[in-house]
From Swiss-Prot:
PROSITE patterns: PROA
GO MF term list: glutamate-5-semialdehyde dehydrogenase activity; NADP binding
Catalytic reaction equation(s): L-glutamate 5-semialdehyde + phosphate + NADP(+) = L-glutamyl 5-phosphate + NADPH + H(+)
Taxonomic placement: Bacteria, Bacillati, Cyanobacteriota, Cyanophyceae, Acaryochloridales
UniProt protein name: Gamma-glutamyl phosphate reductase
Pathway: Amino-acid biosynthesis; L-proline biosynthesis; L-glutamate 5-semialdehyde from L-glutamate: step 2/2
Organism: Thermosynechococcus vestitus (strain NIES-2133 / IAM M-273 / BP-1)
Any GO BP annotation: L-proline biosynthetic process
């Protein structure tokens, strides 16, 4: 995909909508925590009241998706079960219960008597969130945007159009009973609007794409607006020579089969050669019973009947019940493989060797590095963030699951009493005190 970046028409319907969100976001940013939390409770109540309406809209989307032969991983994201919707609603209330991310003083310093510097958190402004399927993302993103004082413009995939529109209408009904302006949260419905939205860097402060590798790379390559997200979720699980094999089997099954379409599901299993003969037949039987197709290197294929993996398999994010397996001679080889093929998302080791675990945790370069637990824990809700807008694999923060802290920035506030720089310059310059104060 490619897109020529051009100056948008200032009078287009989309530009007018985005400008309206920008203006309403300015009002939202002035509201106190009680007002924003009250709005979230109204949204949660509205979603509960509209539960059947939302599920019916999603059922219609799913029926259409089946007719259109939507691929399995996208369909898994699209389907909104009663429990998934209930979890999304619970997430709204959990976000409301989190500490206020705004107005937090991170630095408080006296530069001189009567000249006080503060660094205080504030909203980013307007978020543009573009996602494939995932109707529950509308709930998550709207709640995080409201809590963090940001406006939000959402664009879901066409496959989820009924679900997203019904959810957004419900959110607006809740906001109309609150102090938060409903116009601060908007939903786009036309695919053609994406390319224009990506050009609106004057009014949109951050783009958050959620979807396939190709989709995220398209967004990253076609906008001047900062992009938060990850294009790949190629996660590994390394089973060390000192692993508890029962733990390793349970963790492997969970990390691959609990939700194979998730970006934090493993795609490659690395096994130390010293335990491969004892471990691989057992884990392969469990995986195959769960419907997983196995693709292994020559050593793995000698131990267990499976397809021979190609070079491409080590670099593939399947998002499906497919797992590549490689037998490695030692921890160094596992680290090298991860460094070569990993996407910087989440990597895990299973071992009872504390030194090996410590080295893995220290040396692997990823947003999440785990010991003796499933990669599926890489999630904002499970981390206690309430919800997440996405996962970032960038080196600069925010990194990993992005919740409220990743949706605020800060400003420096300096309060004086007629102070001027000339006082602190020249031969008789007055010295700064630079005394830290309590925050």
């Amino acid at each position: 995909m490619s897109l020529e970046l051009t100056t948008p028409m200032t009078n287009s319907p989309l530009v007018q909508r985005v400008k309206e969100v920008h203006e309403q976001a300015r009002l939202l940013a002035t509201l106190d925590a009680a007002a924003r939390n009250g709005a979230l409770e109204q949204v949660a109540c509205a979603l509960e009241e509209a539960r059947e309406e939302i599920l019916a809209a999603n059922a219609a989307d799913c029926e259409q998706a089946k007719a259109n032969q939507l691929n399995a991983s996208l369909y898994a994201r699209l389907e909104l079960s009663p429990s998934k919707l209930a979890a999304a609603i619970a997430g709204v209330r959990q976000v409301a219960a989190l500490p206020d991310p705004l107005g937090q003083r991170q630095l408080h310093r006296e530069l001189d008597t009567g000249l006080i510097l503060s660094r205080v958190t504030c909203p980013l402004g307007v978020l543009g969130v573009i996602f494939e399927a995932r109707p529950d993302a509308v709930v998550q993103i709207a709640s995080l945007a409201i809590k963090s004082g940001n406006g939000a413009i959402l664009k879901g995939g066409q496959e989820a159009s009924r679900s997203c529109q019904t959810i957004m209408q419900t959110i607006h009904r809740g906001l109309e009973k609150s102090a938060v302006p409903a116009g601060a949260i908007a939903l786009l419905t036309q695919r053609s609007e994406i390319s224009e939205l990506l050009q609106l860097d004057q009014w949109v402060d951050l783009i958050i794409p959620r979807g396939s590798n190709e989709f995220v790379r398209y967004i990253q390559n076609n906008t001047r607006i900062p992009v938060l997200g990850h294009a790949d979720g190629l996660c590994h699980l390394y089973v060390d020579r000192a692993a508890d094999l029962e733990k390793a089997i349970a963790i492997t099954l969970d990390a691959k089969t609990q939700y194979p379409a998730a970006c934090n599901a493993i795609e490659t299993l690395l096994v130390h050669r010293d335990i491969a003969e004892a471990f691989l037949p057992k884990v392969a039987a469990a995986l195959q019973q769960a419907g997983v197709e196995l693709r292994g290197d020559a050593i793995a294929c000698d131990l267990v009947p499976m397809s021979l993996a190609s070079e491409a398999d080590w670099a593939t994010e399947y998002c499906d019940l497919i797992l590549a397996i490689k037998v490695v001679p030692d921890l160094d080889a596992a680290l090298d493989h991860i460094a070569t093929y990993g996407s910087g998302h989440t990597e895990a080791i299973v071992t009872e060797d504390a030194a090996a675990a410590a080295r893995f945790l220290q040396e692997v370069d990823a947003a999440g590095v785990f010991h003796n637990c499933s990669t599926r824990f890489a999630d904002g809700f499970r981390y206690g963030f309430g919800a997440e807008v996405g996962i970032s694999t960038h080196k600069l923060p925010p990194r990993g699951p992005v919740g409220l802290e990743g949706l605020v920035t800060y400003k420096y506030q300096l309060v004086g009493n007629g102070h001027i720089v000339a006082t602190y310059s020249g031969a008789n310059a007055r010295p700064f005190t630079h005394r830290d104060l309590d925050c």
